[in-house]
Amino acid sequence: MVKSYTRYEPTEFFGVIASSGCNILGQPSSSAKSVGRAIVGGLESVLEWDLKTGQLLSKWKDSDCSAKVTCIANFDEMYAVGYADGSIRLWKDGELLITLNGHKSAVTTMDFDKMGTRLASGSMDTDIIVWDIVAETGLFRLRGHKDQITKLLFITPPSKNTAEETVVDTDIDSGDMDVDSKSSDSFLLSVGKDSFMKLWDLSIQHCVETHVDHQGEIWAMCVSPDAKRCLTAGTGSDVKVWEISFPDDNNFTPTTKAFQQLGTFTRQSRDRPITLAYDVSNRYVVFQAHDRLLEVFRLRSSAELEKILNRRRRRKKSEDVSITLKDEYEPFALIRTTARASSVAWIPGNRTPTLVTSLQNNSIEVYALDVKSEGSAAPLTERASRISAIEIPGHRADVRTLALSANHDVILSGANGSLKLWNKKTTSCIRTIECGYVLAASFINNDKCIVSAYKSGELEVYDIASSSLIERIQAHDGAIWDLAVGHDGTYFATASADHTVKLWSLKSSFDFVPGTTRKVTTLKLEQTRQIDFTDDVLAVKISPDGRFVAASLLDNTVKVYYLDSLKFFLNLYGHKLPVLSMDISYDSKLLVTCSADKNVKIWGLDFGDCHKSIFAHQDSIMEVTFQPDTYNFFTCSKDREVRYWDGKSFDLILKLRGHHSEVWALAVGPTFVVSGSHDHSIRLWEQGDDLVFLEEERERELEEQYESTLVSSYENAEADGEVKDGDVAAVTKQTIESLKDGEKILEAITIGIEDLDQEIQYRLDLLKSPGKARGPRNPILAHLGVSAEEYVLNTFKKIRSSHLDDALLVLPFEHVLSLFRFIDIWASRKWSIPLVSRIIFFLLRTYHRQLTTTVKMRPLLNNIRSSLRGSLQEERSLIGYNAAGLSYLRHEWELTHNTSLEDIDSTSLEVDGKKRAFSNIV
């Protein structure tokens, strides 16, 4: 009989407040009492935090994506999220709208245009892609940078800021419609690590300006809200200031530049910048570098600059004076965060300018500027104050140890600086204890206390109910690497770098309350015995039956002793590097060890024989733990995986993937597994309803490997066939979803062509022999009761718009020719003209040379052209009619709702003695 296992599935991860590799967004809150909201990346999820209460409002995660979030941009409440695999997902109200694939590596920067209909994205693959959000497809790919894109922004010429957003001239009778494309963001500004600053004209899809004024990488850029100034910062402390001045069409010459460098001013920090950002009022600009310093500059008003100019004229008694950039940008505040900053953003909507910053130690801080200190002599470091922070829901450092309570409802985690207790059901932090560098911790005394071991050699015992320290002792002269609790929870063993294993027990004692005669019961740690070794002890374990104690040494061996007499029993050797962790089975018959040599060895405790040696991981194995009451065990490694093994057959059952960094710790319950990682996350894996069969699991892994190889082969083939010359290219990227969609189209065309040919042959046979019955149709078409052309069109309609172009690239050319037969039918019957037009235009662009040399396609293409021209004219007329109607409704609404200030009659105010009320003032 084939043995089956229960599948472990990822259910939740917690402990992450903000990932260091993603920017942060500040958003206003609906509550007047709240400071605002923060939108940050949390590994593969997007987290929304309330900055006042520290509550996690929502978590957005696509179950099909395991890549890390690298970039976030927003248009109002619609968020574009870029991932490390190059994909982009659009979210609104916590729901996934669309997925866009085009980049071949991590997305580094994104920006929406002012209408929110286009999105520009830059990546580590040096490409810029402009996306059409409405059509859910990529418009074009811009090439020109030679290294990673660090920042890009849509630019609207300042002269057009006050113009109407959209100008529509409509001729209802003819259906002509002209939309002024220049009214929208028609320029794109980009900077990269190649030291280039490029200005792209999106109307012609070409780079019109390139500036190479920086000596090295350009790490940050921002544009003022009025689009008149641009700031760029590179590797040094200098900030370059650019004036944005787009020439009119009449004054345009080939040598005219829209960006003119005005000069530089200096930041205080010497580290490379990460973020530059203007606030919405255009009064302040913040500079964030790769350190703990945030610098805020204030932009002086024209009146202040005029005072400075007059003062200089009086001092020099000359008119030959001018304003410098140092005069315009005044250092206003210096903010020193508690750790290195990852990103910073302004929070709009607050009365005082407020900054939110994510830190590299997995926390978020909020600072408010003291605007009353403008013009005062207050120190720069005292002009901003921290008003809130989010620190409790996560550790400041990587998770080094995990433990479970006896009832498996509470999870204990330890890191450098803190111990935390988590509710397993709600994944909320219920206790936080400040401490030192924790290397091991566990529950003792019937889950009433916690014992923790530190790198300094200290042992501490805490009372859980009060979170108070009961006792602290210097237990060892070196770091305590491991801690093992006995079967009844009243004693434990510690393994240290001072070459000893010490056994400890909890003793109750009575102490007098100072100043009184009352006695209180306290717990004390008492060392009972000690085992001396010649090398550092890295791990220790006590058998469940209380008979043995095992210790792993730096000399790659494991020594087993009788616990009662501490007499030597077994010496286990075979590992090539030190054993980092070990565990003993529930019946005390098996010992499993894991080592830095990437191997797991299973030993018998009867005679000390090695049952099996398994090459288990691709990197050092950090911990191994048996599943309760079974011989199955789990391992975790620096290769970011948790693996599930059968200790009897020595087979690999499951690979649990999800962590983005080294996995340091494991805790195994009866039906779940908890893992802690260097990425600050604690992940929970629980048993599901699915069963795992080893053969099926291996086949599934091989299929995943084949699919990934297939996708990479398509990408390599496309890369070999791409023309690298030129600034513009098509937006294509094959994914496994697009390949599957292409196979669906291929299958539908094959079935449809057979049915069409059968129909033609049947009509020819009717001419020869009237009354002849038609042969059986394809079972799929017969079951659905549709014609071949309807079936193929329905297949296209089911494909995502973002996958359509990539799916069409999968088709062989002979199937493309067959597809044109269906396009001819669809165009003549006026079915789904927008979809049909998109398909035919893409095929004509892709296979233009082949189609023009195929003689038999000429009549078919002529038929399609004549049919499609009339249909497109009707669609154009319909759009023009609707646009005219919307323009009329907008005009009527403005007449009834908008009132200008010139309508106010001052004489009527004097007579009536009261102000006139207005519904809205624009």
From Swiss-Prot:
The keyword Phosphoprotein applies. GO terms for cellular component: cytosol; nucleus; Pwp2p-containing subcomplex of 90S preribosome; small-subunit processome. The keyword 4Fe-4S does not apply. Gene3D superfamilies: YVTN repeat-like/Quinoprotein amine dehydrogenase. The modification Phosphoserine is found at residue 769. Pfam families: Beta-prop_WDR3_1st, Beta-prop_WDR3_2nd, Utp12. One of its GO terms (molecular function) is snoRNA binding. WD repeats lie at residues 63-101, 102-141, 169-210, 213-252, 268-307, 336-377, 394-432, 434-472, 475-514, 532-571, 574-615, 616-655, 658-695. Keywords: Phosphoprotein, Repeat, WD repeat. SUPFAM superfamilies: WD40 repeat-like. GO terms for biological process: maturation of SSU-rRNA. Belongs to the WD repeat WDR3/UTP12 family. This is Uncharacterized WD repeat-containing protein C3D6.12. It comes from Schizosaccharomyces pombe (strain 972 / ATCC 24843) (Fission yeast). The lineage of its organism: Eukaryota, Fungi, Dikarya, Ascomycota, Taphrinomycotina.
